[in-house]
């Protein structure tokens, strides 16, 4: 996925001077998270359909939805308020969590927020965590492997006949 290439190992908050608080989203955050979802993926609009506000509201109540809150008040970032990044995971029928998205505001990329969100999400997981990734996206596959994910299987035609995916799984708590 070209849309995941920004998920590169990045400097820490200490190195960049950017600090965020990672916390569980509240119902007051969902419109800002939905706005972030729309602006976080501009490089592949023909391949990516943002989730609507209605599902973000449901995920505030029913899923693990973490936000990276940037200091500076509610209007420090265009469109997403003080939310610099977000992660959403939801339970599957197989007693795992599906890591659906990690996204970082374009103004905040490269500051370690994606790493902070991934670490916080995995720390909260009480079961294995799975995700899907384009098998040709070597940078993302390597990044996920660095976080402890392993390839479970490859599924050709996962979304459309030409859109293949690797299912990668993190073992969860040890």
Model regions and ranges:
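Conserved GNAT acetyl-CoA-binding A-motif
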Residues: 118, 124-136
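Short hydrophobic/aromatic beta-strand or adjacent loop that forms the aromatic wall/cage
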Residues: 1-4, 63-65, 163-167
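Conserved N-terminal entry element of GNAT/NAT acetyltransferase domains
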Residues: 2-28, 170, 174
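Residue-level detector of beta-propeller blades
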Residues: 83, 151-154
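Conserved beta-strand-loop-alpha-helix junction that forms the acyl-donor binding cleft
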Residues: 106, 131-141, 157-162
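Acetyl-CoA-dependent GNAT
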Residues: 6, 20, 24-109, 115-120, ...
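Conserved active-site tyrosine of GNAT-family acetyltransferases
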Residues: 1, 144, 149
